[in-house]
């Protein structure tokens, strides 16, 4: 009896409970508008804030808001995407072999995290070498003897800007290699760790290398983060689009709007720190903002013929959710949380530490709580 009930559910797809096609259709338009506006606003604030003092990426307000967004992304990976992948790949509509014989969700998440590390490393290497070649060509053209003068302590050479990176002491999204360079820089002098004063000739050379690494990191981080966000946004949009239940769609509208706004804020901050040209930044922002609404539109178009409980749909959803979880968890922990919370600026500012930790836990807690409804 139980097996026949399961077979009927797998063949029929969504339950008829609370099913209302016309009401669901109208709610999907509301969802598209709400999520589009939330995502666009979230990603636009850091980009516009580059020209506004209180919203600049060097400001404490931005750092605290980014900590909240990092908590949202971390909870999205652990609580929403990994849980969703586990639910899909353990669905009784799937055959026992191989899906019940191995913990595939955790495995796919691990593979995605390791692959992200590899892409992270290779991408950083590529951009660093590209920038070093550009600098070498510039020095050769201008005369290496004049360019090679060691800069005055505390100043930065304008030729060392990476991808248009602006001067300033703001927190940068850096990875393992850039952290190593930072520690070499910090330990090369014996005093002045938090007072902003540094001594020693090695610092002039470290600044140039650190700038190249930081600029490359900003570019790579923003691109990988967008990839991770877009990959799960499509699945989220499709899931909402194929649903014909207003009871399911209503809470999803609020949850996804909240989720999209703060993911957009984190992505916008990464794009802003990478100092992309306005055209490239606009394209990346629009691509992010349109992904989930596009998924909802596609899901709405195929809702009448789509069976969310078919083996193909479940496997696709489960694998993509698990892969997205691995990417998001890696990006949140390594490139957002660790990079900022282990930085010199954070360690030297107790108030910023407290506020950032509160915002981080608050973002993770609120996003986790949304799993009750969505």
UniProtKB/Swiss-Prot annotation:
Residues 50-61, 123-218, 272-282, 340-353 are cytoplasmic. One of its GO terms (molecular function) is zinc ion transmembrane transporter activity. It is found in: Plastid, Chloroplast thylakoid membrane. It is a multi-pass membrane protein. Residues 83-101, 240-250, 304-318 are lumenal. Keywords: Chloroplast, Ion transport, Membrane, Plastid, Thylakoid, Transit peptide, Transmembrane, Transmembrane helix, Transport, Zinc, Zinc transport. GO terms for cellular component: chloroplast thylakoid membrane. The chain crosses the membrane at residues 29-49, 62-82, 102-122, 219-239, 251-271, 283-303, 319-339, 354-374. Induction: In shoots and roots by zinc and copper starvation. Inhibited by excess copper ions. Residues 185-206 are annotated as: Disordered. May play a role in the transport of zinc in the plastids. Could also transport copper ions. Belongs to the ZIP transporter (TC 2.A.5) family. PANTHER family: PROTEIN ZNTC-RELATED (PTHR11040:SF44), ZINC/IRON TRANSPORTER (PTHR11040). This is Zinc transporter 4, chloroplastic. It comes from Arabidopsis thaliana (Mouse-ear cress). The gene is ZIP4.
């Amino acid at each position: 009896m139980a097996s026949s009930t399961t077979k009927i559910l797998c063949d029929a797809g969504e339950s008829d409970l609370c099913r209302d096609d016309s009401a669901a259709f109208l709610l999907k338009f509301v969802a598209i508008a709400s999520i589009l506006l939330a995502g666009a606003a979230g990603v636009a604030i850091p980009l516009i804030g580059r020209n506004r003092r209180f919203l600049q990426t060097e400001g404490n307000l931005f750092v605290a808001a980014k900590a909240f967004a990092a908590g949202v992304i971390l909870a999205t990976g652990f609580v929403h995407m990994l849980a969703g992948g586990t639910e899909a790949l353990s669905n009784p509509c799937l055959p026992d072999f191989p899906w019940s014989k191995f913990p595939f969700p955790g495995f796919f998440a691990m593979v995605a995290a390791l692959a992200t590390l590899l892409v992270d490393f290779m991408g950083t290497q590529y951009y660093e070498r590209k920038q070093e070649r550009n600098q070498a060509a510039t020095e050769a053209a201008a005369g290496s003897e004049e360019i090679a003068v060691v800069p005055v302590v505390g100043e930065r050479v304008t030729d060392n800007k990476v991808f248009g990176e602006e001067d300033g002491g703001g927190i940068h999204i850096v990875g393992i290699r850039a952290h190593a360079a930072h520690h070499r820089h910090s330990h090369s002098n014996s005093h002045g760790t938090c007072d902003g004063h540094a001594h020693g000739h090695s610092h002039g050379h470290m600044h140039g290398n650190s700038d190249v690494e930081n600029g490359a990191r900003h570019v790579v981080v923003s691109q990988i983060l967008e990839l991770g966000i877009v990959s799960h946004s499509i699945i989220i949009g499709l899931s909402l689009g194929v649903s014909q239940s207003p009871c399911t769609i209503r809470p999803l509208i609020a949850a996804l709007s909240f989720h999209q706004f703060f993911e957009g804020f984190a992505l916008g901050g990464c794009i802003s720190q990478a100092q992309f040209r306005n055209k490239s930044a606009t394209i990346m922002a629009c691509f992010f903002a349109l992904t989930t609404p596009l998924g909802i539109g596609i899901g709405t178009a195929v809702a009448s013929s789509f069976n969310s409980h078919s083996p193909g749909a479940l496997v696709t959803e489960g694998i993509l959710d698990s892969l997205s979880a691995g990417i998001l968890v890696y990006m949140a922990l390594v490139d957002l949380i660790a990079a900022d919370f282990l930085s010199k600026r954070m360690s030297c500012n107790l108030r910023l530490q407290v506020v950032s930790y509160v915002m981080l836990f608050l973002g993770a807690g609120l996003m986790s709580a949304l799993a009750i409804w969505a």
